[in-house]
Amino acid sequence: MKIEVQQNIINIVKSAYLKKQQKEAEAQRLLDSIDDYLLGELGITLPKEEEHLPQNTDKNNSYNLVNDNPLVKKGRLFLTNLSEVTGKRIDPDYYSIYYMEIIKSIEGSYYKTETIGKYCGFISGYAFSSNDYIGQSDCILITIKNILKNIITLEEKTFLPSQYYEMYPKFRVLENDLLIAMTGATIGKVGIYNSCEKSLLNQRNGIIRSKNLNTFYLMNLLNLDIYQKLILRNSVGGAQSNISGKEILKINIPIPPLEKQNEMATHISQIRSKANVLMQQGKETLEKAKQAVEQMILGN
């Protein structure tokens, strides 16, 4: 193969990869704008986390609570009323100033705040035995690996005997159900089940079934960084955090009128669609370049 042809191949591939990266970066900018849009529409101003992070301080500092004490300024030393911890959690981080500021920011929303439980029901998954798994059927078991941020992926499927769908009606996953991971590395991540395939829910996952909320709005809200932090705050466990359905339903969220929820959901959906188009364009650009290179090689 001539040197000129080799160089041309290199240029085509490099150009395609560059265009793909540009498309992906543009798509990511769109996706990153969703959180700011949602927070802005709700009137939530985020506290600056660095202002409340524990810092190393001089060992000679006094432990009084005056405002000029560095421990107080950095949120490492604070007071909590006994009534707030009696019969409740006593881990200090739960009552940290940063978490209190997050809650205050949410309560300062343009809209009233209510617990998720006032508008949604919750169903925990069932502990199906791995001995019941089979190679193929029309009954899918949704496990924690299927629940990602904003999406329920069915690329890897686990199957149960078909009759289980009728045997365990309580644990059926319905189309447009909001699913949440309740343990492990993806704890707190929520996604909407957009399939009509028959599915049951495995243990340590939950269904948040909305009564009169826009599910897409709720999904994007719970996937906000501040809500992911609140979910972790309400979790328990050492090496592996776990959260219960009861704790999830206690979380307060802004409740705009349904029309406003629908408006925000539509806008966010449009942003995601544009981002998906850009991602697909990037893939197609690279694929066309590969085909062009293949033709050049075969032609020589």
Q: Which sequence ranges carry the predicted segments?
A:
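A short glycine-rich beta-alpha junction/loop motif
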Residues: M1-E4, K198-G206, L213-F216, V236-N262
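Non-catalytic DNA-recognition/assembly elements of restriction-modification systems
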Residues: K2-A127, K250, P254-N300
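Sequence-specific dsDNA recognition surfaces
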Residues: T113-D132, K145-E175
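A short beta-sheet element
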Residues: T143-I144, Y165-F171, E175-N223
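Flexible, active-site-proximal loop/turn residues at the rims of small-molecule/cofactor binding pockets
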Residues: L148, A185, P257
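Short amphipathic beta-strand starts and helix->beta connectors
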Residues: I192, N234-G237
